[in-house]
Amino acid sequence: MNNYLRKLVEGQHLTEEEMYKAGLLLLNENILESEIAAFLVLLKAKGETAEEIYGLVRALREKALPFSNHIQGAMDNCGTGGDGAQTFNISTTSAFVLAGADVKVAKHGNRAVSSKTGSADLLEELGVNISSTPNEIDYLLEHVGIAFLFAPVMHPALKRIMKIRKELNVPTIFNLIGPLTNPVNLETQFVGIYKRDMLLPVAQVLQKLGRKQALVVNGSGFLDEASLQGENHVVILKDNEIVETSIEPKKYGFSIVKNEEIRGGNSKENAKITLGVLSGEKSVYRDTVLFNAGLALFANGKAKTIEEGITLAAHSIDSGKALAKLNLLIAASNEKLERVN
């Protein structure tokens, strides 16, 4: 590890292979916590490259719990977090809207690191069993259409690193790679990131991971979600080609909503917001979810255009299908799934 730390101190980039090997060392129980913290801080200070991100993703996916089944059409809409905006759980709420539109959602997530309420905190508050095993997740994806993949369960080797990340309380490369380390072989993905200069590198990593289609967004105000505040910077991966563009919400009929207007709170407060959206209440929260879910449906290919995606998202909510998916997941995730273990 010392060789890699020296390179980072000197501001040098690591190659993909060096980062892969460094990643395996980070997961080794014999490494010192001070070495892990130093590596994460130095890497953040230098700035991460696509090669470094992919190298670490390789290491983490190699050490993750294995999945035996390929779920056709599975997607994730997990964001990086780390934007400091303290918004409500936009992507987690949107995940049920996607599921209600007949998209299989393998939602990768964790407890809060730099926010008040992470996806795991919200789902636990809503009554979802967040600790499903790979076999149970396969079952949930096949029969419910949505499953939650709790990062500490999927990546047991990350336990020490999670503790250090919490103590550091600053975004690290693990914020960036969280959405990229989903152990399910996804076909499509919608990723919100907090660092605008990482849009292209993250899209390049998704391409290397074999995604058929993907959309990476950095929202107005550097939100790690699509924002109704103004211009959103986007990179689209389709047919193995990467295109950079921008998206204005007003083009799709949305009123301007400042990011401060969609702040969330603790898990109870955010659960109330999520249930309100899924129950069809009209609000700035609903509009934000419609925009993000619409983009995700476009990224998935379920919708041919963003406009169609927004229409499908609204139907998912207003038909009751999105809320039904939440209730199904609560029930099924808490069953004793002995038949699949």
UniProtKB/Swiss-Prot annotation:
Cofactor(s) of this protein: Mg(2+)
Pfam families: Glycos_trans_3N, Glycos_transf_3
Subunit structure, as described in the record: Homodimer.
GO cellular component: cytosol
Chain residues that bind Mg(2+) 1: 91, 225
Record keyword Magnesium present: yes
Glycosyltransferase keyword on record: yes
GO biological process: L-tryptophan biosynthetic process
An MF annotation (GO) of this entry: magnesium ion binding
Residues given in the record as anthranilate 1 binding sites: 79, 110
Keywords, in A-Z order: Amino-acid biosynthesis, Aromatic amino acid biosynthesis, Glycosyltransferase, Magnesium, Metal-binding, Transferase, Tryptophan biosynthesis
Residues at which Mg(2+) 2 binds: 224-225
Catalytic activity, reaction form: N-(5-phospho-beta-D-ribosyl)anthranilate + diphosphate = 5-phospho-alpha-D-ribose 1-diphosphate + anthranilate
EC code: 2.4.2.18
Positions of anthranilate 2 binding: 165
Organism: Bacillus cereus (strain ZK / E33L)
Manner of cofactor binding, per the entry note: Binds 2 magnesium ions per monomer.
Protein known as: Anthranilate phosphoribosyltransferase
Stated family: Belongs to the anthranilate phosphoribosyltransferase family.
Protein purpose: Catalyzes the transfer of the phosphoribosyl group of 5-phosphorylribose-1-pyrophosphate (PRPP) to anthranilate to yield N-(5'-phosphoribosyl)-anthranilate (PRA).
Annotated residues for binding of 5-phospho-alpha-D-ribose 1-diphosphate: 79, 82-83, 87, 89-92, 107-115, 119
Pathways per UniProt: Amino-acid biosynthesis; L-tryptophan biosynthesis; L-tryptophan from chorismate: step 2/5
